[in-house]
């Protein structure tokens, strides 16, 4: 029977040496938002606690400044 090995999650920010997450970097922030507009949890993305907090703050700031939507675009 073949065993399924799950790929180890790692913090992208630690690996790339990023020290601060900028709220103006919308393309980066979009990668950590679900289709519904929710912030994806760190247990799914593998982001460390320190950067998950910075990420959440940056996303909330970008939402407040209308750089990111609060929710998805409702159709119908």
Curated annotation (Swiss-Prot):
Q: Which family does it belong to?
A: Belongs to the bacterial ribosomal protein bS18 family.
Q: Name one GO cellular component term.
A: cytosolic small ribosomal subunit
Record-linked InterPro entries: Ribosomal_bS18, Ribosomal_bS18_CS, Ribosomal_bS18_sf
Could you tell me which species this protein originates from? Psychrobacter arcticus (strain DSM 17307 / VKM B-2377 / 273-4)
Query: What protein is this chain from?
Result: Small ribosomal subunit protein bS18
Q: What does this protein do?
A: Binds as a heterodimer with protein bS6 to the central domain of the 16S rRNA, where it helps stabilize the platform of the 30S subunit.
Keyword tags: Ribonucleoprotein, Ribosomal protein, RNA-binding, rRNA-binding
Q: Which gene encodes it?
A: rpsR
Please provide, alphabetically and separated by semicolons, the GO molecular function terms listed in this UniProt record: small ribosomal subunit rRNA binding; structural constituent of ribosome
Quaternary structure note: Part of the 30S ribosomal subunit. Forms a tight heterodimer with protein bS6.
What does the entry give for GO biological process?
translation
């Amino acid at each position: 029977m073949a065993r399924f090995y799950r790929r180890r999650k790692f913090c992208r920010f630690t690996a790339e040496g990023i020290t601060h997450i900028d709220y103006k970097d919308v393309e980066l922030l979009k990668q950590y938002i679900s289709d519904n507009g929710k912030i994806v949890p760190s247990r799914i993305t593998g982001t460390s606690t320190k950067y998950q907090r910075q990420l959440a703050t940056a996303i909330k700031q970008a939402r407040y400044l209308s750089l990111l939507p609060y929710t998805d675009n409702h159709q119908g």
